[in-house]
Amino acid sequence: MDGATYQRFPKIKIRELKDDYAKFELRETDVSMANALRRVMISEVPTVAIDLVEIEVNSSVLNDEFIAHRLGLIPLTSERAMSMRFSRDCDACDGDGQCEFCSVEFRLSSKCVTDQTLDVTSRDLYSADPTVTPVDFTIDSSVSDSSEHKGIIIVKLRRGQELKLRAIARKGIGKDHAKWSPAATVTFMYEPDIIINEDMMDTLSDEEKIDLIESSPTKVFGMDPVTRQVVVVDPEAYTYDEEVIKKAEAMGKPGLIEISPKDDSFIFTVESTGAVKASQLVLNAIDLLKQKLDAVRLSDDTVEADDQFGELGAHMRGG
């Protein structure tokens, strides 16, 4: 349609925010944008992870490749990842991926000299760049020496066993390998729109109202102790199971409660691996999403645009 516009102005409202957790509302947009944001957070926000391991000495019970795999999965603080270069694009080292602009070097050297088992952990990795280090999950410094807060275990050594290695961490994205994903989990749900027919509800006895409330597997509804009316106490607890709707129909009251998802309102839950803070993860994803949308909007090659962003690219062009 000539003159049609799909322009919207999405809004975000923060509900809960911690270093590794965020919960927020995304409103005034559609599901294609919400899902695009979710996927960018999981697979396209860059982080730094160990990508190359040179084993010098390994007399532990684990093979070299086992240790290299474990090292790759250790989350590293990645606040500066957005400003780093991808090793494949770095002209300072001709793509070798071992310079200060595209990589960070780590060293590890541990040897067990007692009869006590020695735990080699992520805290034994020494970084050449103090801004890129293994994530410290210790919250309370007073318990930092406890067995639960010694870092991620890489291998256990017995007397005489030794592990010495050099590792190179590089910038990457989760689309290439899961070790670069900054997100432990990212989910969103449609915000439910729950409508109670008060006239029909008034025809029910208190016992029937209680039966209706208890038919929901999650505590979505409750009864007002003063008015004795059924009220919505936690709409977000609804899991779209339709049990309360089926109960109303079984009671001969179809239409007593109507529940539908709001197609322009979504509730996001984001958990970070610790590589970047949850708030920064969301902001970085939005920046990357804007870059992608600009590329789609300016692209003359519709096939290329659709490869880049699928259904959202077609939607933006009005297709």
From Swiss-Prot:
The task this protein performs is described as: DNA-dependent RNA polymerase catalyzes the transcription of DNA into RNA using the four ribonucleoside triphosphates as substrates. Component of RNA polymerase II which synthesizes mRNA precursors and many functional non-coding RNAs. Pol II is the central component of the basal RNA polymerase II transcription machinery. It is composed of mobile elements that move relative to each other. NRPB3 is part of the core element with the central large cleft and the clamp element that moves to open and close the cleft.
The question of whether Iron is a record keyword is answered with: no
Per UniProt, subunit arrangement is:
Component of the RNA polymerase II complex consisting of at least 12 subunits. Interacts with SHH1, CLSY1, NRPB11 and NRPD1. Interacts with IYO.
Which GO terms of type biological process are on file? DNA-templated transcription; stomatal complex development; stomatal complex patterning
- Cite the HAMAP family for this sequence: RNApol_arch_Rpo3 (MF_00320)
Species per Swiss-Prot/TrEMBL record: Arabidopsis thaliana
Protein's UniProt name:
DNA-directed RNA polymerases II, IV and V subunit 3
> SMART domains, per this entry?
RPOLD
Instruction: Give the record's family classification.
Output: Belongs to the archaeal Rpo3/eukaryotic RPB3 RNA polymerase subunit family.
Q: Does this UniProt record's set of keywords contain Nucleus?
A: yes
User: Keyword annotations for this protein?
Assistant: Acetylation, DNA-directed RNA polymerase, Nucleus, Transcription
| Location (main, coarse) | nucleus
* Superkingdom field: Eukaryota
The entry lists its GO molecular-function terms as: DNA binding; DNA-directed RNA polymerase activity; protein dimerization activity
